[in-house]
Amino acid sequence: MRILLVEDDELLGNGLQVGLQQSGYAVDWVKDGQSAELFLGAGAYDLMILDIGLPKRSGLEVLRALRGRGGDLPVLMLTARDTVDDKVEGLDSGADDYLVKPFDLDELAARIRALLRRRSGRSEPVIRHRDIVLDPASHAVTRAGRPVEIAPREFAVLLQLLENRGRVLSRAQLEQNLYSWKDEIDSNAVEVHIHHLRKKLGADLIRTLRGVGYVIDKEA
């Protein structure tokens, strides 16, 4: 999953980027509203974390422009202003959720999971497929009730394929949700992650369509 983080506070932004990356998200971090609009136009994101008080263009202006273009990207707004009017303005401008600073990283992560779950149409917090259970909150995977050790990027690949069962995802689509724009990408990184997942969860779990991509088929 790829997140656009828009936060001008250096200390907070760095902490959020590191924390979210450790949770398995690919994070692009920008520090002003103009840059946010450029990144929104150039990349595909699953969620945006947007501070209200930004230089060059405010978070509310960025949000209104996004919604005005018909963009349905989930947006979690951050603010230091804890008044009802501020919250109402943010939500009425199109925010999906609202978090007041200071906040706990665990709460932010839980709100992100809820927004992503809502967008994918899931009501249950865990994902089940055959004898596999994946829990995004704990980053845990079990097979036939037994824990399976999964590396963070393997987990991210598995989550993306499970949330898109029946849909073929190209290597480029998988890479886009694994890496931020600053990361160096090995040419065969996705293939390596797929290979490891097959060894751990079954050779027939992920199907390859040569020249097209990878898919986990829906259960009959």
Predicted segments — roles?
Residues A140, G145-L205, R210-V212, K218:
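Positively charged, aromatic-enriched patches within helix-turn-helix-type DNA-binding elements
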